[in-house]
Amino acid sequence: MRTDYCGLIDKKYLGQTVTVKGWAHRRRDHGGVIFIDLRDREGLVQVVIDPDTPEAFKLADSSRGEYVLSITGIVRERPAGTANSKMISGEIEILAKEIEILNAAATPPFQIDDENLSENVRLTNRVIDLRRPAMQKNLRLRYKVAMGVRNHLDKQGFIDIETPMLTRSTPEGARDYLVPSRVHPGEFFALPQSPQLFKQLLMVAGFDRYYQITKCFRDEDLRADRQPEFTQIDIETSFLNEDEIMDITEGMTKEIFQDVLGVTLPTFPRMTYGDAMFYYGSDKPDMRVALKFTELTDVMKSEEFKVFRGAADMANGRVVALRVPNGASFSRKEIDDYTQFVAIYGAKGLAYIKVNDVTKLNEEGLQSPIVKFLSANGLKEIIARTGAQNGDIIFFGADKAKVVNEAIGALRIKIGHEHGLENGYFVKEWRPLWVVDFPMFEHDEEEDRWTACHHPFTSPKPGHEDLMATDPGKCLARAYDMVLNGWEIGGGSIRIHRADIQEKVFGALKISPEEQQNKFGFLLDNLKFGAPPHGGLAFGLDRLVTLMCGAESIRDVIAFPKTQRAQCLLTNAPNAVDDKQLRELNLRLRQKAEPSA
């Protein structure tokens, strides 16, 4: 029987006979004495095997990396000068008396401590990859976060209730994963994009406080913070307003950071969506970066410079400046690199002014190809509004507001992370905030219709109900997002609890009464049976843990993730199925799967 984990054997076991089990992490032969570092989920312990125990020595000699071993021996102090203070077991070693090889191992595709691996190699050999201490640490932290959520919500009176994984397809922004029904030919289930409607119905049913940690599915293009299946911490409450819901979830987040990381988070400030877009070009601003936009659209309406004037006169145009302290030292190559970077977001160029002498608002004091095209008053306004000092650089964005916000917003983050620490406009701290007062709708220019910013079940702010019909663009929602270091880790809203208001929202979205009844009849019908005011919030567990681990991708905090092409390299999923299975489901393929390489 195992005495304890390898990584937990310490001086309290001195002189005792212990049994440890794990993997041979490293084997060394030093002058006739064999050393094996035995590894399990808690870490390593050093085992010494000398020739005085011939049977154990023989088995140790035949062992190789990743062999699974059971070792019994006596715990003793390491010789002077060989202790490792970074390990719990670093002051002791085990003098082996018995060794049992529980299983041999083929040579692994890479060394467990190899850090220079491509992601494809790691994901193809995910089981071996998961043996690496970094991955063990990440998944242990994920477990602690999930337990922290459960413990906190349990204390707050929330009930864990499961909702269906097979449900009907309803539009929620992304494509559904569809599951054909064998029993009902020609009909399909959908895997849930979220438990949204079911959790609202649980509030109508009177459960008052619900939560679950559940899988959700979205068939969308993937990025570093996206997976086709992801884990959501889903929360819903009755009879609470947005302030009360934000207080509960903020308290939960603070408690988790304190318990798991030993970090005390500050009170979460609140920022309107309008301010977030105005100053940072993003609804999830990274507040570690102190750089802000300076609005210049009004100034440029009076200028002759076509690039700026054209954007300023555009219906949805915007002109902003981004002042970077000490940025005048940026090289031509750096500026060219930034120009290429903003082009990713649709920017056609990146104008700039290097400020050499603020007392000379001309080409002598301001270094830039665009200075000669701007009036003295325009230059004066730029310097005054940005607060530029000698040695600064000012970058400009001029285009449709969407392009400017995305391009200059991304540039703000990039420069902040690359140069902010040494120049005082970046802090290595946790900077959470709430973003509130989101628009209820956004206009889809391609389809020329209004769409829901969050989802169509979000309640409008009191007094904004009539705007849904008269001026949807000015209608604000009772929605709120929790943002941490530039990542949206949670989003929620107060829901619509009256059927007549829900029907008005559907009407604003051009969903006909027939379509409303077909897709959402079960919701509308039940809202009429005395639905309480209710609201909630959903956290992305994967994103939250990624931030807490300092990982580069959510794939580093998920045991068996998909690639950016929505494939599992370990199991080669998705895969083609045989014709018999298709016939049973009454399906015929229009396009056959390509043969595997």
UniProtKB/Swiss-Prot annotation:
CDD domains in UniProt: AspRS_core, EcAspRS_like_N
Main EC class the enzyme belongs to: ligase
Superkingdom: Bacteria
GO cellular component: cytoplasm
Region (Aspartate): 196-199
Keyword annotations of the record: Aminoacyl-tRNA synthetase, ATP-binding, Cytoplasm, Ligase, Nucleotide-binding, Protein biosynthesis
Subcellular location: Cytoplasm
Entry EC number(s): 6.1.1.23
SUPFAM superfamilies: Class II aaRS and biotin synthetases (SSF55681), GAD domain-like (SSF55261), Nucleic acid-binding proteins (SSF50249)
Keyword hit for Zinc: no
Catalytic activity from the UniProt record: tRNA(Asx) + L-aspartate + ATP = L-aspartyl-tRNA(Asx) + AMP + diphosphate
Site (Important for tRNA non-discrimination): H30, G81
GO biological process, one term: aspartyl-tRNA aminoacylation
Residues given in the record as ATP binding sites: R218, D219, E220, Q227, E488, G540, L541, D542, R543
Molecular function terms from GO: aspartate-tRNA ligase activity; aspartate-tRNA(Asn) ligase activity; ATP binding; nucleic acid binding
Record carries keyword Ribosomal protein: no
Amino-acid positions noted as binding L-aspartate in the UniProt annotation, renumbered to this chain: E172, R218, H454, R495
Stated role: Aspartyl-tRNA synthetase with relaxed tRNA specificity since it is able to aspartylate not only its cognate tRNA(Asp) but also tRNA(Asn). Reaction proceeds in two steps: L-aspartate is first activated by ATP to form Asp-AMP and then transferred to the acceptor end of tRNA(Asp/Asn).
PANTHER family: ASPARTATE--TRNA LIGASE, MITOCHONDRIAL, ASPARTYL/LYSYL-TRNA SYNTHETASE
Subunit structure: Homodimer.
UniProt record similarity statement: Belongs to the class-II aminoacyl-tRNA synthetase family. Type 1 subfamily.
Name this protein carries in UniProt: Aspartate--tRNA(Asp/Asn) ligase
